[in-house]
Regions:
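Acidic, glycine-rich active-site loops and adjacent beta-strand->loop/helix elements
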Residues: 75-77, 138-146, 168-171, 211, ...
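Acidic/His- and Gly-rich active-site-bordering loop/insert found
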Residues: 2-101
Length: 482
């Protein structure tokens, strides 16, 4: 198309990449393609056991004393197809269909996230007319399902003064910070006993209809957490009626705000009508509390068989008390970046294991000290109740480096080149830059990229004029960085 002039080679390389299966966990083929690409250029290249690739290219003549630069992106893609598509991601090429200013696939994800960034990196690599300081290219794997590639990068494997990540998905946006995170697993001993005499009715109580959402993205909207709403109502029922809890389950993913939670209760038949009335009243109260952000909130109560076995009182008390007291949602906002959530937690999953009831709490913060405080607070609450808790899965934050030389130069150049001013932002989710900052603590980082709409869906498409603009900008930035 006419708007693509300098980025023609980028689209050619992207088409080549689209011939190679690269679903997360199946990246050897695309990793080998990149290795051979570098070898054909006579460049130093290293591939590790996670299929991460590091390519080193010397500085352009006269640029030997410029800052060293890392270009970074991930090579895997999310593979999703329409229900009526028979596309086989393990072997079939991804179509590159251009309509007007946009490229999309054929009823599948396109893989522009982050394949277009990778194609830009390779186009830069083979262009010997491009001016740049000492340069390394880092291609990471399995970003979409756990950032395993970035987790595997070791100190000394890659180095540079500046790192340019090409995985931001809105042209003119520059990401300068992301949250770190960890999980806290609370394990309550699962003690059961026979149902007590007189408890001759069963009720299933479901909190449903909530929006849920990604706990690193939608947490700022302060949506209802189904696990905590269910717990709060159960506590109020317990204050008025004899109740035995037979089961409790809610949430499915560590990074999703739970939209549904279900409990089964053993109650006295004479109290059933009153309990149903109380729950109906509580539904109105919670719609008043959450109706703006969660207008679909619904309480569903159904008669079920009377449970033969219920939780012991100690199990029920520890479960209800912990979830009731554990603060959920936004804890603090950034003092440096307007409207950015700094620290949050999500009571993500409550599930029965063989011998315990596990509560999984996902904690995020762009401030490492705040992250530590909240994790310790959640563990201390468990210990206070006499149950065990452990911290797992930590990954570092990419803390905002206000006034960094890289940010100053990148934003200044962008605003010289384009009428649309740069939008500097941060996100509350985890990014590869956060992990890489752990092994590159003195490297200044920034992230940008072309506009990609509906990533991770068959409607994914990339705006081609933005590919041209970002590539032209990247070339200019590499030549100018000091």
């Amino acid at each position: 198309m006419e708007s693509i002039v300098q980025a023609k080679r980028v689209l050619e390389i992207f088409k080549e990449m689209s011939q190679i299966p690269r679903e997360s966990g199946n990246e050897k083929g695309i990793s080998d393609y990149i290795v051979n690409f570098a070898k054909n250029l006579g460049l130093e290249v290293h591939q590790d056991d996670q299929f991460n690739v590091v390519i080193k290219k010397p500085a352009s003549p006269g640029y030997e004393n410029r800052p060293s630069i890392i270009l970074q992106g991930h090579i895997d893609m999310v593979c999703v197809r329409d229900h009526d598509s028979n596309h086989d991601f393990s072997k079939d090429p991804i179509a590159n269909i251009i309509e007007g200013e946009w490229m999309h696939a054929d009823h599948t994800t396109l893989g522009a996230d982050n394949g277009m960034g990778g194609a830009m990196m390779l186009a830069i690599l083979e262009d010997d007319s491009q001016q740049h300081g000492p340069m390394q290219l880092l291609f990471t794997t399995n970003e979409e399902t756990g950032m395993d590639g970035a987790f595997a990068i070791k100190e000394g494997q890659v180095s540079g003064d500046y790192l340019l990540n090409l995985d931001t998905e809105v042209e003119h946006d520059f990401t300068v910070s992301c949250a770190g995170g960890c999980h806290v697993h609370v394990n309550i001993p699962l003690l059961r006993e026979n149902n007590q005499p007189g408890y001759d009715a069963g009720l299933s109580f479901t909190v449903t209809g909530l929006k849920g959402g990604h706990s690193g993205i939608e947490i700022n909207e302060q949506r209802a957490n189904a696990n905590q709403v269910l717990t709060r109502v159960l506590y109020d029922i317990q204050q008025q009626y004899p109740v035995c809890l037979a089961s409790f389950e809610g949430g499915v993913k560590h990074n999703a705000i739970p939209s549904k939670a279900v409990a089964v209760l053993s109650v006295r038949a004479e109290d059933v009508a009153a309990i149903k009335t109380l729950i109906a009243y509580q539904e109105k109260q919670y719609l008043h509390e959450y109706g703006i952000q969660d207008p679909g909130l619904t309480f569903v109560v159904e008669d079920v068989a009377t449970p033969d076995v219920v939780y012991a009182d100690d199990t029920t008390e520890a479960l209800i008390t912990y979830i009731y007291l554990a603060q959920d949602g936004v804890h603090s906002v950034s003092k440096s970046i307007p409207n950015l959530v700094e620290t949050s937690d999500n009571i993500a999953i409550v599930r029965e294991n063989e011998h315990t009831i596990e509560i999984l709490i996902s904690i995020r913060s762009s401030n490492s000290n705040s992250l530590e405080f909240l994790a310790k607070k959640m563990i201390l609450l468990a210990k206070t109740l006499g149950v065990s808790a452990e911290r797992t899965g930590g990954y570092p934050a990419w803390e905002y480096d206000k006034g960094s030389k890289l940010e100053e130069q990148a934003i200044s150049l962008h605003n010289e080149m384009f009428d649309t001013p740069a939008n500097v932002n941060a996100i509350h989710a985890g990014l590869e830059c956060g992990l890489l900052k752990g092994v590159l603590p003195n490297t200044q980082m920034i992230s940008f990229g072309p506009t990609i709409v509906s990533p991770h869906t068959p409607m994914e498409r990339v705006h081609l004029p933005s590919v041209e603009n970002v590539y032209v900008y990247l070339k200019a930035l590499l030549a100018k960085l000091q």
